């Protein structure tokens, strides 16, 4: 099953937060996909789910604070029981304008020096039913927010090449889809059958033309969608009119 631990909206007593995290329990494995932006929200939502055990794998969709900084709770409570899977660019210093949006430096140092870190660029199979995408090819046009990062001592445009997703028994879980949600899904189809797509679609502030293209794309698909996090209210409103739309929030449990 998949449990939504962090999202911008929450059900009943659960806590909402700008960010994303999901717990995937499959084939006797516990996989934490992202960790939200701080310890408090992750801790409290795990408590409300009555989740006390550690994680066999941690997968980072990309190196932004709202997906990684909740790892402080995981590290401090010794809940990492296995590999941490990430792209090398997740550890770059990242900015939105003058605002630092990368991974907290203490967390970054721990992951790089003490964790069993698996750096990937190509698809990585955890087992026969679980695959992490690695780098997502950008074959279809998409609109992207302007980010910067530090490379070789210089501040340059960040293409967010560390953007990755995970597929568990046909359910595609994406953190922010900085590669473009159509690119994410179409690449996912090359790796696995797709039965559903959930997570951040990153459609805040996009043009009407692009948003309409996304809506038409999902209207033509035969799997369910659960847009969350950075999808945005306007896009959620339009996507919610589709027959394959499912509402997602913290506290949601999805069977797989």
UniProtKB/Swiss-Prot annotation:
Any one GO molecular function term: transferase activity
InterPro entries: DHPS-like_MBL-fold (IPR041712), Metallo-B-lactamas (IPR001279), Metallo-beta-lactamase_dom (IPR052926), RibonucZ/Hydroxyglut_hydro (IPR036866)
CDD domains: DHPS-like_MBL-fold
Pfam families assigned: Lactamase_B
Family of the protein in this entry: Belongs to the metallo-beta-lactamase superfamily.
Name by which UniProt lists this protein: Uncharacterized protein MJ0448
